[in-house]
Structure formats: structure tokens, C-alpha cells
Amino acid sequence: MVLSGKDLAAHRKEEILFQGLSFCLFPHQLMTITGPNGIGKSTLLRIIVGLFEAAEGHVSLKDHEQTYPVATACHYLGPQNAMKPFLSVIDNLQFWSAFYGQYLRSPHEALADMGLSDLAPLPFNVLSTGQKRCVAIARLLLSYRPIWILDEPISGLDSHAQTLLANLFQRHLNQGGMIIAATHSPFGIPENHKIALEKFVPSQERRE
């Protein structure tokens, strides 16, 4: 399985966010996307997933010469946690488990992996920012998807949670998974590719 992007570009109204961006990702590999706020990291992730259309270029996922939509093989974690605020933590995860349909771990097992078993009966909206993010990450464990595409996954996490997440990422990579993550901070595990998005901003836009 190979996930690649070729000569990608994105525009925001008349502004060119980035252009000429290419990458190629294989199993067991982590690619991080860095850059200041507003430069287009989230836009790039959404283009890769297929939520946005690139202004130029294309993204492809190939396995044994067959091409597949990226969305069919990925978990996407955006800046929002995609949880219903007044449902309990466990009810939220049970909803996602039923939605995915292909079980890898039960909601209780996913929470245990994240060290969050005690939070299961609590309404999602009473959790701290970091706890909410960890519950959202637990969603990735419910059903196996080889590609994880993550937007600032460690935002709001304390050092203990960041270490736990780094171990989780490494386990996914060791199992043949791929991860693409926008981040301001390193995860503490080896990065195979690092895209500094400011390098793909046209020089005129950069000066402005």
C-alpha cells in the first residue's frame, strides 16, 4: 500500500496557501506536517482525506496496482473531537463502534488502552480539554484502518498523555500502519518524513 500526493496546491479565495507539494508514504511510516497557524495544515489533511479538492495535483492510494479512495482506508481526527457533548463517554464510543461496523476493540477496551476507564459513565462535556482529546483518540482503536490522518492530536494533552499517545502511534506503525499528522510539537518517535509547509508557500505570498 502506497499513499502519495503529487504537485498539490490549495487556494483560499485569491491567496495561494501552498503549491508544488508532493509526498509518498509507505507502511510503517510517520509523516508530520508543521508550520504556523493559518498556513494550511488542516487544509492539506482534508485534501488527503478527500474532504477538500486540491486546486492542483492529486492524491492516490494504491495497493497491488488497485487504486482506492483514501477515506475507505483511514481514520481522520480533525480539530474537533466529533463527540456528542451530552452523551456519556461510553455511549459516544458505542455510537462510533456501531458506525464503523468492523470491530477491533470494544469501547471499554479502547478506553482502557488510553487509561480512561474511569471516565466511561461521565457526560463528554464535563471532561477536561485533554481528556476529551484522549477519548477522541480512543475512537481510532475501535476499528482497524491502516492510515491515521490526525490534526493536532496532542493539543491540550499533558506529558503523561503525550507519552501514552506516542506509544500508541508506535504500535500502529509497528503493525504496518501509516500516520500523517499536523503538529506543532514532536511526538517523541522517529519521523520518516517531515513537511515544513512554509517551504511550499510561493515567495510572493511569503513576503506578504
From Swiss-Prot:
The keyword Kinase does not apply. The lineage of its organism: Bacteria, Pseudomonadati, Pseudomonadota, Alphaproteobacteria, Hyphomicrobiales. GO terms for cellular component: plasma membrane. Its EC number is 7.6.2.5. Pfam families: ABC_tran (PF00005). NCBIfam families: ccmA. SMART domains: AAA. GO terms for biological process: cytochrome complex assembly. Part of the ABC transporter complex CcmAB involved in the biogenesis of c-type cytochromes; once thought to export heme, this seems not to be the case, but its exact role is uncertain. Responsible for energy coupling to the transport system. InterPro entries: AAA+_ATPase, ABC_transporter-like_ATP-bd, ABC_transptr_haem_export_CcmA, P-loop_NTPase. The gene is ccmA. One of its GO terms (molecular function) is ATP hydrolysis activity. Its main location: membrane. This is Cytochrome c biogenesis ATP-binding export protein CcmA. Keywords: ATP-binding, Cell inner membrane, Cell membrane, Cytochrome c-type biogenesis, Membrane, Nucleotide-binding, Translocase, Transport. Residues 3-206 form the ABC transporter domain. It is found in: Cell inner membrane. Coiled coil: none annotated.
